[in-house]
Amino acid sequence: MMHCASIVSAPSYAFPFRSGSASTTPTAISLTKRSWKPPPSMAKGPVRATVSIEKETPEANRPETFLRGVDEAQSSTSVRARFEKMIREAQDTVCSALEAADGGAQFKEDVWSRPGGGGGISRVLQDGAVWEKAGVNVSVVYGVMPPDAYRAAKGVPTDQKPGPVPFFAAGISSVLHPKNPFAPTLHFNYRYFETDAPKDAPGAPRQWWFGGGTDLTPAYIFEEDVKHFHSIQKQACDKFEPTFYPRFKKWCDDYFYIKHRGERRGLGGIFFDDLNDYDQEMLLSFATECANSVIPAYLPIIEKRKDLPFNDHQKAWQQLRRGRYVEFNLVYDRGTTFGLKTGGRIESILVSLPLTARWEYDHKPEEGSEEWKLLDACINPKEWI
């Protein structure tokens, strides 16, 4: 079966790829909002965008919306319009908070559009005082889904042969890599996907779903930090459905599994996809709540850990764990691998990768060490709250 992640043409890592759950659950073994404002260099002149693939057009200014005219004209209260508004506000809020935490560095911004409609905003901060590399991207994408992918995605009987299926997708995606090895990496992604009726089947019902998640990847375990992070995820989930947190926590543990290493990328959080079995308004509110929970879940941890002293050994361990991050993203992450195979916007696709990483031959931490404790937790997921 073909996942939608493998049929969507997306020019940005921020694109909301539809991801499947992990194929196998591994066996355990021992071992207040602020609006982001452009820096003075942006405010004085047009926003400059890097040249990328042919199907993208660099834009000098941020538009009010990336929606097509027909969508914009229909209603500003549509789910498409409100989701785009939500992710752009979330991008501004997160970027403002990250710049404040860094104390000096500012995001570089690229704005782009596509001839068929849609576009995106990529923001990256690197070599700051706190952040080695931080990327916060949003995108709105229109495209056409091949018939086989539509049948695979929605379970259309094999004797039906719908024509190409127009789709709409929007999302925010971010990966934040701090410099200090005691400060954890964070990833979050929230996305919305719609398909229109197949072109040869007018009147067929529109399909839609939500996906996303927020997960933490530390190099060293501070139990109070991990408990705080998971508590915020649970609070967001419990406002809507008490089964969400345990269900999405396990989904996260299973999805971010590095099969060739037999370990997970980090200490989890929440992850969900193909979510459409609840009221659409409820799920829009849920995705909004999750996005709004990113800063309160993460920034208090950064403030506590960003200035802790560390030594070369601890930095080297962080770089080894960053190597695991690279392995997962380049080998298993559907958004990244699809973008690389289809000629997407390379700078946006690889924004998730850390500025530096490390690989050592047959490295094994000493049993009982702090490094070993982290590895054990990545191999054997724990219930933190």
UniProtKB/Swiss-Prot annotation:
The organelle transit peptide extends over 1-67
Residues recorded as binding substrate, renumbered to this chain, are 173, 189-191, 343-348
Keyword line: Chlorophyll biosynthesis, Chloroplast, Heme biosynthesis, Oxidoreductase, Plastid, Porphyrin biosynthesis, Transit peptide
Task: Decide whether keyword Transit peptide is in the record.
Answer: yes
Q: Which PROSITE patterns match?
A: COPROGEN_OXIDASE (PS01021)
According to UniProt, residues marked as the site described as Important for dimerization are 260
A GO biological-process term: protoporphyrinogen IX biosynthetic process
Q: Which GO terms describe its cellular component?
A: chloroplast; cytoplasm
Q: Where is the active site?
A: 187
Cite the InterPro entries for this sequence. Coprogen_oxidase_aer, Coprogen_oxidase_aer_sf, Coprogen_oxidase_CS
Could you say which tissues express the protein in this record? Answer: Highly expressed in nodules and to a lesser extent in leaves. Not detected in roots.
Catalysed reaction, written as an equation? coproporphyrinogen III + O2 + 2 H(+) = protoporphyrinogen IX + 2 CO2 + 2 H2O
From the Swiss-Prot or TrEMBL record, what is one GO molecular function term? protein homodimerization activity
**Pathway named in the protein's UniProt entry:** Porphyrin-containing compound metabolism; protoporphyrin-IX biosynthesis; protoporphyrinogen-IX from coproporphyrinogen-III (O2 route): step 1/1
Enzyme Commission numbers on file: 1.3.3.3
Q: Which cysteines are joined by disulfide bonds?
A: none
Gene3D superfamilies cross-referenced by the UniProt entry: Coproporphyrinogen III oxidase, aerobic (3.40.1500.10)
What compartments host this protein? Answer: Plastid, Chloroplast
Chain's role: Involved in the heme and chlorophyll biosynthesis. Catalyzes the aerobic oxidative decarboxylation of propionate groups of rings A and B of coproporphyrinogen-III to yield the vinyl groups in protoporphyrinogen-IX.
The text of the family note is:
Belongs to the aerobic coproporphyrinogen-III oxidase family.
State what protein this is by name.
Answer: Oxygen-dependent coproporphyrinogen-III oxidase, chloroplastic
Natural source organism: Glycine max
